[in-house]
Curated annotation (Swiss-Prot):
Keywords linked to the UniProt accession: Endoplasmic reticulum, Heme, Iron, Membrane, Metal-binding, Microsome, Monooxygenase, Oxidoreductase
Note: This protein differs from other forms of cytochrome P450 in that it catalyzes the 21-hydroxylation of progesterone, resulting in the formation of deoxycorticosterone.
PROSITE patterns: CYTOCHROME_P450
Name of this chain's protein: Cytochrome P450 2C5
Protein residues bound to heme: 432
GO CC entries: endoplasmic reticulum membrane
Function in brief: Cytochromes P450 are a group of heme-thiolate monooxygenases. In liver microsomes, this enzyme is involved in an NADPH-dependent electron transport pathway. It oxidizes a variety of structurally unrelated compounds, including steroids, fatty acids, and xenobiotics.
Organism annotation: Oryctolagus cuniculus
Length: 487
């Protein structure tokens, strides 16, 4: 048969299948914009700012609606009430991990972030327990972060108050904290092995936030055969996994079951002690990759955005430094006990996380069983997008949400004020495993920097652009330079 005829017949079959799937599902699922055959609602969504497009849809269809990403229906939850009801009140039903094809290729259903069912429960339980035992929120992890904060300050001193782009240095610090927890070892900032690891992690986050990846994730079977940056991401992921496997082999040679040094040792001991199919070398490598992905780039991007916002608002930076001077002084390192006596600094860090909205649409969830949600029927396995933007930028909880204002987290007396709407780490059973670690890092790194340096912009604060350059998977700040002036 003529290849052209085969192609036309194939496209016709695909078109009919798409129309049938859309029509069969739309009566039961929440309402939403009318999808085109095959491509769904992709042309109606801005790949550079997905969250903005979802907000527009919510104005038409309410807090629960359906969009088609390609041929696949995805239910979107918009606003605090809908997000909380799903992730917290119905946590078990909404605890599945939704589909991200490019990352599924990397994880193969293993690890912490992109696994499901028993694998996810076992990995999450083990990771939380191990991180707690090594001091998640306790003293030993704090010691490691304080050590890295001192190294960070020394690296910043080496800039000699000259203009610099802080991206690399601010990436090294949280990466080294993860290395300390996982490998029992930190790296010099000029170590070639470390630099290559950093480069691979940085590039993959940029790729994940690109419009091309949003398109790829909707048509993976087709685009696998075409060149593109998805190939670069997979190549980087292979490098990271090979790097981790080499470290695992080194640990196997030196393993002392009575004296575990780090996360890898604990995992290897678990493998020896239990005949558990969830604990294999491959799942160890993926779990460590997940910890790197979650614990390095997210924190470094937040730090980078933090300094940009403090440059934009020098009066805020000055007030934080006054509080540091009053509570900590100049002659000792900041510690976590200081945070309770520094309400303004605590409010500033919370406001930074709220304002930058690092993961606008969260990682996708999926329902683990058929669910009736607000009178709509959502079949088992349906992907769920929870708009964290709609929660963090809620006008009732945070008046003038588009304005950077630490007062969003302060009461009338200047005391720190908690908010249920503060969900930068998501909520419920899939809440970020490394939340405690990230909170400690943000506080200790930022206070250490501001204790030792005045931040100086190269342009007038009013001329600084703080608009995220990409709002896809991660909100990425624009590039900038500054001077670290020793105090």
């Amino acid at each position: 048969m003529d290849p052209v005829v085969v192609l036309v017949l194939g496209l016709c079959c695909l078109l009919l299948l798409s129309i049938w799937k859309q029509n069969s599902g739309r009566g039961k699922l929440p309402p939403g914009p009318t999808p085109f055959p095959i491509i769904g609602n992709i042309l109606q969504i801005d790949a550079k700012d997905i969250s903005k497009s979802l907000t527009k849809f919510s104005e038409c269809y309410g807090p629960v609606f359906t969009v088609y990403l390609g041929m696949k229906p995805t239910v979107v939850l918009h606003g605090y009430e809908a997000v909380k009801e799903a992730l917290v009140d119905l946590g078990e039903e909404f605890a599945g991990r939704g589909s991200v094809p490019i990352l599924e290729k990397v994880s193969k259903g293993l690890g912490i972030a992109f696994s499901n069912a028993k694998t996810w429960k076992e990995m999450r339980r083990f990771s939380l327990m191990t991180l707690r035992n090594f001091g998640m929120g306790k003293r030993s992890i704090e010691d490691r972060i304080q050590e890295e904060a001192r190294c960070l300050v020394e690296e910043l001193r080496k800039t000699n108050a000259s203009p610099c782009d802080p991206t690399f240095i601010l990436g090294c610090a949280p990466c080294n904290v993860i290395c300390s927890v996982i490998f029992h070892n930190r790296f010099d900032y000029k170590d070639e092995e470390f630099l290559k690891l950093m480069e691979s992690l940085n590039e993959n986050v940029r790729i994940l936030s690109s419009p091309w990846l949003q398109v790829y994730n909707n048509f993976p079977a087709l685009l696998d055969y075409f060149p593109g940056i998805h190939k670069t991401l997979l190549k980087n992921a292979d490098y990271i996994k090979n790097f981790i496997m080499e470290k695992v082999k080194e640990h196997q040679k030196l393993l002392d079951v009575n004296n575990p040094r780090d996360f890898i040792d604990c995992f290897l001991i678990k493998m020896e002690q239990e005949n558990n199919l969830e604990f294999t070398l491959e799942s160890l490598v993926i779990a460590v990759s997940d910890l790197f992905g979650a614990g390095t780039e997210t924190t470094s991007t937040t730090l980078r955005y933090s300094l940009l916002l403090l440059l934009k608002h020098p009066e805020v930076a000055a007030r934080v430094q006054e509080e540091i001077e009053r509570v900590i002084g100049r002659h000792r390192s900041p510690c976590m006990q200081d945070r309770s006596r520094m309400p303004y600094t605590d409010a500033v860090i919370h406001e930074i996380q709220r304002f930058i909205d690092l993961l606008p649409t969260n990682l996708p969830h999926a329902v683990t069983r058929d669910v009736r949600f607000r009178n709509y029927f959502i079949p088992k396995g349906t992907d769920i997008i929870t708009s964290l933007t709609s929660v963090l930028h809620d006008e009732k909880a945070f008046p003038n949400p588009k304005v950077f204002d630490p007062g969003h987290f302060l009461d009338e007396s200047g005391n720190f004020k908690k908010s249920d709407y503060f969900m930068p780490f998501s909520a419920g059973k899939r809440m970020c495993v490394g939340e405690g670690l990230a909170r400690m890092e943000l506080f200790l790194f930022l206070t250490s920097i501001l204790q030792n340096f005045k931040l100086q912009s190269l342009v007038e604060p009013k001329d600084l652009d703080i608009t995220a350059v990409v709002n896809g998977f991660v909100s990425v700040p624009p590039s900038y330079q500054l001077c670290f002036i020793p105090i």
